């Protein structure tokens, strides 16, 4: 046990979500949870099931935190196990108690089972009591479970493991049988275990097989081996079609072949081989688990047929620990010295002499059985299941290490290389994966002879860069991972002199894998293998600097590897050409688009620096090849994308250090013209090439060293104008960046092309049939120099928002882009220019703040409002304006932002808060804002406004009734009438609290009502705001305060009632008419002598005669509710309202009912 396990008394010992040290609080809590068990199960057959479940879940959660590093718990596990064992009462120990397992015992076994899962059964079972007297109670307990219907399989597994460790004791079994016959006890134990072999597959089967195998391995159990094996083999032959029974039999056979003495089984090996031969070759249809068991069976048959010996011919390195190697007197150097070379040659000669002696081994016994085992284990190396291949690889190593001479081992390795690498690997990744695992296992055991390295190393080099492009990509990942493991094993196995001829090749392949592999676990595997190689082999060039740069943790981030780590590594002359070749041949043409992009960036970063052994001509040749390949007609779109992207990045990287591209000017200029026919708008390959062209033009323009003729500029501009109006957002975004670079490089002084752009922009803004075209033209305006934007173009931008047409009413994204363009133009313009366009700009932005366009995606107008708020804050804070302009627009802009800070969309509220905060923080704009201290306190943290309940923070501003009152009321009303439940509740509650506070204060209440009436009148044409007001009207009319008895004395109330009537009468929307009925129902609470009451009652009675059944029913319900709560009510009217079917189609019945109600109520 680890007595010095690291303890973390803080909460900082965490890497990711895994602990790096034991948190002592976790240990204390685990112990406390175990101590709680007797309290929870205080009664014999009763317990608090909820408390027991909560206790167990917390215990399991704490334990599983250490699942990846269970050794951290070793210091405390013995105490925990002892405490749990004390709580277990086995049947038969106390004869006074009933023959049944108590709930406390079962729960304790369940806790022990979790410990087994986390730390491993072999570790935990050693800590269980081994006393001989426990045998009978364990047997009685397991026999009780045979008849039990409980589904506690984990607890039974713990009992079986406990029985196994007790059976291992070398005691005389006759003590436990009255007749003194040990066979009776063994039979009893085996019968108990055999019961669990019939279950469906779970861990109990393996434990039961272990118990049986150890019974047979005992001296008094050996006579039973023959008969038991005979029955087992007969059962396998009988049940080979039944997967459940076959699996159980194979697990039992495996346990017997492993644990029973080889000398006992040797005599029966021929029978076993003969009886099981019908199961081979392995049928993959039987399932992965059975196939794995069959592989294990055949390898153990082979192991029994061979003598267990340490082969004299196996390779023995000697020192395996790094401490011993570090004590070596040889000094590390990048190039081996002359003396090292001499020693290496002498070592090689010695090894050859040893090989001559190795042939003098014994002859192979049971050759037919061994050949049979090796043949099927080697076949299993190409099985489709990973677990089967892994088991087969271990089997190859175990069998080969027992072969009597090295010629046989050489044949095994030759078979692996010829059958699993080369052409066959191109069609199946399983072959390469299994072969790499097998080579690693052979190297571990020292049976992969140095003379075979010449054949092995090329195969491993190919496997380290293997890609299964046409299949499932994870298969290729497995091969590369296994290849890293194999190289790691080779590094640990061989002397530096043996590995010296191949060392640099393998180190270079590992370095490329550590830097450029797609998967993080494979980059880490390659890094670990490289570190092992540098540590154990002393001839890796620049080894120490390499493993410091390509560290296990440093390679975690792929972007960092491609953009940063590869550059200093490429500066080492040994690896410069290798890294470039790997990027060019493997990564630029990779199947993953993201890898191709990152490889191109790596080429740019590396080409920016001068490398010692890489000439500029080499780069030019690469560029020439890429440009030609990207223009070929019959080429994959993926390859075209990779080549063209790499060309662009190479151009940019090389021009940064002054390379001349005048010789390539024509080829580069013709790229867009040649590739445009491949830019189909309707296909994915076409979209890919469009994205690539955008990036290529951006990179070439950013280099600023590639000169274009006027004709070429015009063609490139035409291509960009097509790309920037693409319907796909990602292509427009890339084209926008490309246009920005293209304009800065080629159009700054070209009046003709700028005029061409202006004409296209004005035409698109004036008359356009596609939203994406207008978005694209807005992006171009954003990219142009502000001096190039004349007033005509600026006015055309503004008019798209100020004077929308029916065809572009839904184009919210186009208006958003227009606002972006206005923002950029205004910020970049001179003071003189802004004084000319400022008023028009803010008029447009205010109009944009009223954009509530909705679509299937919801409120898309919010994008326009958010862009407008950012534009207003940016322009005002930039302070290119005169004080009168600020005085006029700062407060007005702030009002709109206050309104948006109360609306229902969380991100819009956050944006409004951020914009207001910038206005408040700025000294120039802040002095124009009233109540700045209050604003600063409310809008201090934009992230807070994401929460729905943040609306309550606006109450001080609402109570103030200041300049922001009208916009704040509008924002709250829009939220209260929205569909989002969270903001709807909070906004309604805020408005209700405010109304109740002021309803007895006539001036303030009049101000509130007049504000609502004015906003309601103005918003009735905007569906969203009008609907919100209709939603909130019942609440307003239900709390009229001082106007409740005589509401007509308030002009604002009358105005809202009239507006509501107009909407209800003219609207064809059923929802609005139902909301008007709810509002009228609230008005019935007014004084009965008031005009408003009579008007509301009349309208409700008229609605009872409506043609719409839904409206009739709604009106009847509202009238019934009012009459039930009224001080005076007519029972006959209530009975008529309740009993009449208002959704009936019989007009006469309904008319009579309405006439009777009207006669009673109207006076």
Swiss-Prot record:
Q: Name one GO cellular component term.
A: microtubule
Q: Which UniProt keyword terms apply here?
A: Chaperone, Microtubule
Q: Do you know which SUPFAM superfamilies this protein is assigned to? A: ARM repeat
Q: Does the keyword Membrane apply?
A: no
Q: What happens when the gene is disrupted?
A: RNAi-mediated knockdown results in reduced microtubule growth rate.
The UniProt entry, under InterPro entries, shows: ARM-like (IPR011989), ARM-type_fold (IPR016024), TBCD (IPR033162), Tubulin_specific_chaperoneD_C (IPR022577)
User: Could you identify this protein by its name?
Assistant: Tubulin-specific chaperone D
């Amino acid at each position: 046990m680890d007595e010095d396990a690291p303890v973390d008394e803080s909460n900082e010992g965490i890497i990711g979500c895994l602990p790096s040290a034991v948190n002592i609080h976790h240990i204390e809590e685990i112990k406390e949870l175990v101590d709680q068990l007797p309290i929870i199960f205080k009664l014999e057959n009763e317990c608090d099931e909820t408390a027991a479940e909560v206790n167990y879940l917390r215990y399991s959660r704490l334990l599983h935190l250490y699942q990846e590093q269970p050794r951290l718990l070793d210091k405390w596990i013995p105490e925990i196990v002892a405490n749990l064992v004390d709580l277990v009462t086995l049947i038969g120990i106390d004869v006074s108690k009933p023959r049944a397992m108590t709930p406390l015992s079962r729960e304790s076994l369940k806790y022990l089972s979790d410990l087994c899962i986390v730390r491993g059964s072999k570790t935990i079972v050693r800590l269980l009591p081994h006393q001989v007297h426990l045998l009978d109670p364990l047997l009685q307990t397991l026999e009780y479970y045979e008849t039990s219907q409980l589904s506690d399989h984990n607890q039974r597994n713990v009992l079986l493991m406990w029985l196994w460790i007790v059976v291992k004791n070398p005691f005389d079994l006759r003590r436990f049988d009255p007749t003194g016959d040990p066979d009776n006890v063994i039979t009893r134990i085996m019968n108990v275990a055999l019961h669990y072999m019939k279950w469906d597959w779970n861990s109990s089967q393996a434990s039961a097989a272990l118990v049986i195998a150890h019974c047979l391995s005992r001296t008094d159990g050996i006579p039973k081996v023959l008969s038991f094996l005979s029955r087992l083999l007969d059962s396998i032959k009988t049940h080979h079609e039944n997967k459940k029974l076959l699996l159980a039999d194979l697990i039992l056979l495996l346990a017997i072949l492993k644990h029973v003495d080889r000398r006992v089984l040797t005599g029966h090996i021929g029978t076993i081989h003969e009886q099981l031969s019908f199961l081979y070759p392995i049928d993959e249809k039987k399932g992965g688990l059975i196939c794995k068991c069959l592989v294990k069976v055949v390898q153990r048959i082979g192991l029994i047929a061979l003598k267990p010996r340490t082969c004299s011919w196996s390779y023995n390195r000697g020192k395996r620990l790094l401490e011993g190697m570090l004590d070596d007197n040889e000094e590390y150097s990048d190039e081996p010295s002359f003396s090292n070379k001499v020693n290496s040659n002498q070592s090689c000669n010695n090894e050859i002499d040893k090989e001559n002696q190795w042939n003098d081994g014994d002859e192979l016994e049971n050759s037919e059985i061994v050949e049979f085992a090796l043949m099927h284990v080697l076949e299993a190396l190409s099985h489709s299941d990973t677990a089967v291949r892994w088991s087969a690889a271990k089997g190859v190593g175990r069998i080969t290490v027992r072969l009597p001479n090295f010629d046989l081992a050489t044949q095994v390795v030759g078979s692996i290389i010829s059958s699993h690498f080369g052409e066959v690997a191109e069609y199946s990744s399983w072959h390469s994966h299994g072969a790499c695992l097998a080579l690693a296992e052979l190297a571990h055991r020292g049976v992969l002879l140095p003379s075979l390295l010449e054949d092995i190393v090329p195969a491993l080099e190919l496997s380290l860069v293997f890609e299964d492009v046409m299949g499932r990509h994870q298969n290729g990942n497995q091969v590369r991972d296994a290849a890293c493991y194999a190289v790691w094993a080779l590094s640990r196995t061989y002397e530096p002199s043996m590995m010296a001829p191949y060392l640099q090749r393998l180190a270079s392949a590992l370095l490329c894998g550590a830097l450029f592999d797609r998967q993080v676990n494979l980059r880490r595997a390659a890094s670990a293998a490289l570190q092992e190689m540098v540590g154990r082999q002393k001839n890796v060039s620049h080894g120490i600097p390499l493993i410091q740069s390509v560290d296990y943790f440093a390679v975690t981030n792929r972007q960092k590897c491609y953009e940063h780590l590869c550059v200093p590594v490429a500066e080492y002359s040994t690896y410069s050409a290798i890294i470039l070749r790997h990027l060019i041949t493997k990564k630029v043409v990779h199947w993953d688009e993201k890898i191709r992009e990152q490889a191109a960036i790596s080429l740019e970063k590396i080409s920016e620096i001068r490398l010692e052994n890489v000439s500029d001509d080499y780069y030019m040749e690469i560029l020439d090849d890429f440009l030609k390949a990207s223009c070929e007609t019959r080429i994959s779109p993926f390859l075209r994308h990779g080549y063209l992207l790499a060309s662009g990045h190479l151009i940019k990287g090389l021009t940064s250090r002054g390379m001349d591209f005048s010789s390539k000017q024509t080829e580069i200029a013709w790229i867009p013209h040649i590739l445009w026919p491949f830019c189909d708008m309707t296909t994915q390959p076409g979209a890919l090439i469009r994205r690539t062209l955008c990036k290529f033009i951006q990179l070439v323009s950013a280099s600023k060293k590639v000169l274009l003729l006027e004709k070429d500029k015009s063609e490139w501009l035409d291509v960009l104008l097509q790309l920037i109006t693409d319907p796909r957002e990602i292509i427009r975004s890339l084209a926008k960046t490309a246009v920005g670079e293209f304009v800065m490089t080629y159009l700054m002084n070209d009046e003709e092309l700028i005029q061409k752009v202006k004409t296209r922009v004005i035409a698109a803004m004036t008359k356009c049939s596609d939203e994406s075209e207008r978005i694209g033209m807005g992006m171009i305006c954003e990219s142009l120099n502000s001096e190039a934007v004349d007033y005509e173009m600026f006015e055309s931008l503004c008019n798209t928002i100020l004077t929308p047409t029916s065809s572009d009413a839904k184009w919210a994204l186009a208006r958003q882009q227009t606002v972006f363009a206005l923002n950029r133009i205004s910020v970049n313009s001179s003071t003189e220019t802004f004084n000319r366009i400022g008023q028009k700009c803010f008029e447009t932005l205010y109009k944009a703040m009223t954009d509530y366009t909705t679509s299937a995606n919801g409120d898309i107008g919010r994008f326009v409002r958010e862009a407008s708020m950012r534009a207003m804050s940016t322009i005002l804070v930039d302070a290119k304006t005169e004080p009168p302009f600020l005085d006029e627009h700062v407060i007005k802009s702030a009002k709109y932002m206050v309104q948006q800070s109360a609306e229902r969309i969380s991100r819009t509220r956050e944006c409004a808060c951020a914009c207001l905060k910038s206005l408040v923080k700025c000294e120039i704009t802040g002095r124009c804002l009233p109540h700045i201290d209050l604003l600063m306190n409310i809008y201090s943290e934009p992230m807070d406004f994401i929460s729905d309940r943040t609306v309550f923070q606006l109450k001080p501003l609402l109570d103030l009734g200041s300049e922001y009152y009208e916009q704040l009321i509008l924002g709250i009303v829009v939220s209260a009438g929205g569909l989002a439940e969270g903001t709807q509740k909070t906004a309604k509650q805020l408005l209700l609290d405010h109304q109740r506070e002021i309803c007895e204060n006539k001036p303030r209440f009049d101000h509130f009502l007049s504000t609502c009436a004015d906003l309601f009148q103005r918003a009735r044409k905007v569906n969203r705001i009008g609907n919100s007001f209709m939603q909130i009207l019942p609440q307003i009319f239900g709390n009229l305060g001082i106007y409740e008895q005589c509401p007509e004395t308030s002009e604002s109330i009358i105005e809202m009632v009239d507006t509501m009537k107009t909407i209800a009468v003219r609207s064809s929307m059923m929802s609005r008419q139902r909301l008007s009925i709810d509002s009228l129902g609230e008005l019935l609470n007014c004084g009965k002598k008031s005009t408003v009451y009579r008007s509301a009652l009349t309208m409700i009675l008229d609605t009872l005669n409506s043609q719409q059944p839904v409206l009739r029913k709604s009106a009847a319900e509202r009238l019934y509710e009012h009459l039930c709560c009224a001080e005076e009510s007519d029972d006959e009217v209530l009975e008529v309202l309740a009993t009449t079917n208002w959704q009936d189609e019989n007009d006469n019945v309904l008319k009579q009912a309405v006439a009777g109600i009207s006669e009673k109520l109207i006076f």
